[in-house]
């Protein structure tokens, strides 16, 4: 029976949670473990994660600025290209207009030369016609005089 109160006392002392020297030792071990984990593991990991976040942030910023620059350059090149096309079309139109005016001028000159040649040919033909008519008139006069003399001489012979 004497033994029973000791057993009851041990049961009461050895319960689920005792407030003796092991509790502060466990708390101290826990704090030392947390301190070691913080210095050995968490700080380098958070530093690496922070560096990675910073790298991603700067890379995204750089990429977005490069994308904006690329868009600006593309817009500028499109504008320059459309301006060059307009200039080229204007030059082509001006060249076509100049060529058309040169062709029209050449056609007018050719027509004027042709008209001049036709006029000169017509004048020459009229002159030749006049000369031919004059020659024919002279020949007709001569022939009629000859016929007349022959007729008169043949009548005088009869």
UniProtKB/Swiss-Prot annotation:
Which CDD domains does this UniProt record tie to the protein?
A: ATP-synt_Fo_b (cd06503)
Q: Which InterPro entries match?
A: ATP_synth_b (IPR034679), ATP_synth_b/b'su_bac/chlpt (IPR002146), ATP_synthase_B_chain (IPR050059)
Membrane-crossing segments per the record: 21-41
A Pfam family reported for this protein in Swiss-Prot or TrEMBL? ATP-synt_B
Give the way it sits in the membrane. Answer: Single-pass membrane protein
- Show which residues constitute the signal peptide: none
- GO MF: ATP binding; proton-transporting ATP synthase activity, rotational mechanism; proton-transporting ATPase activity, rotational mechanism
Q: What keywords are assigned to this protein?
A: ATP synthesis, ATP-binding, CF(0), Chloroplast, Hydrogen ion transport, Ion transport, Membrane, Nucleotide-binding, Plastid, Thylakoid, Transmembrane, Transmembrane helix, Transport
Per UniProt, subcellular location reads as:
Plastid, Chloroplast thylakoid membrane
Q: What GO CC terms are in its UniProt record?
A: chloroplast thylakoid membrane; proton-transporting ATP synthase complex
| UniProt keyword Cell inner membrane present | no
Reproduce the miscellaneous comment text. Answer: In plastids the F-type ATPase is also known as CF(1)CF(0).
Q: How does it assemble?
A: F-type ATPases have 2 components, F(1) - the catalytic core - and F(0) - the membrane proton channel. F(1) has five subunits: alpha(3), beta(3), gamma(1), delta(1), epsilon(1). F(0) has four main subunits: a(1), b(1), b'(1) and c(10-14). The alpha and beta chains form an alternating ring which encloses part of the gamma chain. F(1) is attached to F(0) by a central stalk formed by the gamma and epsilon chains, while a peripheral stalk is formed by the delta, b and b' chains.
Do you know which NCBIfam families this protein is assigned to? Answer: PRK07353.1 (NF005607)
Describe the family membership recorded for this protein in Swiss-Prot or TrEMBL: Belongs to the ATPase B chain family.
| Function (record text) | F(1)F(0) ATP synthase produces ATP from ADP in the presence of a proton or sodium gradient. F-type ATPases consist of two structural domains, F(1) containing the extramembraneous catalytic core and F(0) containing the membrane proton channel, linked together by a central stalk and a peripheral stalk. During catalysis, ATP synthesis in the catalytic domain of F(1) is coupled via a rotary mechanism of the central stalk subunits to proton translocation. Component of the F(0) channel, it forms part of the peripheral stalk, linking F(1) to F(0). The b'-subunit is a diverged and duplicated form of b found in plants and photosynthetic bacteria.
- Please report the name of this protein according to its UniProt entry: ATP synthase subunit b', chloroplastic
| Organism in which the protein naturally occurs | Porphyra purpurea
């Amino acid at each position: 029976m004497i033994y029973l109160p000791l057993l009851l006392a041990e049961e009461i002392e050895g319960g689920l949670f005792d407030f003796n020297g092991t509790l502060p030792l466990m708390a101290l071990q826990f704090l030392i473990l947390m301190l070691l984990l913080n210095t050995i593991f968490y700080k380098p990991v958070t530093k690496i994660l922070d560096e990675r976040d910073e790298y991603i942030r700067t890379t995204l910023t750089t990429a977005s600025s490069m994308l904006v620059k690329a868009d600006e350059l593309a817009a500028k090149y499109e504008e320059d290209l459309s301006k060059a096309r307009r200039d080229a079309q204007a030059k082509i139109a001006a060249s076509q207009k100049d060529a058309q005016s040169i062709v029209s001028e050449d056609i007018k000159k050719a027509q004027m030369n042709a008209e001049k040649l036709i006029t000169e040919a017509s004048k020459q033909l009229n002159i030749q016609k006049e000369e031919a008519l004059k020659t024919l008139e002279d020949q007709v006069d001569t022939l009629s005089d000859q016929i007349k003399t022959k007729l008169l001489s043949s009548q005088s012979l009869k």
